[in-house]
Design a protein with these regions (language model features):
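Structural signal for interior beta-strand "rungs" in well-ordered beta-sheet cores
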Residues: 102-177
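Terminal amphipathic alpha-helical/low-complexity segments used for targeting or macromolecular assembly
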Residues: 1-103
Length: 177
């Protein structure tokens, strides 16, 4: 299924670089890493977005990516930082993308945390998903994908988060309410 980008890919990339440059200095090496992994991150988002029935993620039988839709942009920033970390190893720009995600939407999802391939955010603002998420077992990851267990699977206990997989209701809810 193709992805329809609201605006254009070039426009989304220009917006990202403007956001990053407004907060940080972006070197040519960092910009090249963004260029190199932008398409891969977009493809990872498209694969995940195509599995959801959320009306904001599809349009005319195609997956929709809107850089101005906060949940989608947060997910994209994570995916881009993750792709650059795994493929390019330019951690300085990964740190800046992570910080931008925190500044833009208060989403604390570190790029070294390997999330499931298919998941979505539903009102993620203020969510914290940290390094403990990498300690999942294969059973826990299976459960996380099916939505059958609680927040401790992803190390999110005692944190409010509306992290969702494409097939589940919220995996993590407030343990403090």
């Amino acid at each position: 299924m193709p992805v329809n980008i609201v605006g254009s890919e070039a426009g989304a990339k220009a917006m990202l670089l403007k956001q990053l440059n407004s907060l940080f200095f972006i070197s040519k090496i960092e910009e090249a890493a963004i260029d190199g992994e932008f398409g891969r991150a977009l493809a990872r988002c498209q694969r995940s977005f195509s599995k959801t029935r959320n009306k904001y993620y599809s349009e005319a039988s195609a997956t929709k990516f809107d850089p101005l839709q906060g949940c989608q942009w947060s997910r994209f920033l994570y995916e881009l930082a993750r792709c650059i970390f795994v493929e390019e190893g330019v951690s300085s720009v990964c740190d800046k993308l992570y910080a931008l995600n925190k500044a833009m939407s208060s989403v604390d999802l570190y790029y070294q945390v390997a999330m499931p391939d298919i998941f979505m955010f539903d009102h993620p603002f203020g969510s914290v998903m940290g390094p403990r998420a990498t300690r999942t077992t294969s059973r826990s990851l299976k459960d996380a994908r099916s939505g059958t267990t609680g927040a401790s699977i992803l190390g999110l206990a005692n944190r409010f988060s509306c992290f969702r997989t494409a097939r589940s209701s919220a995996i993590a809810k407030s343990a403090t309410t």
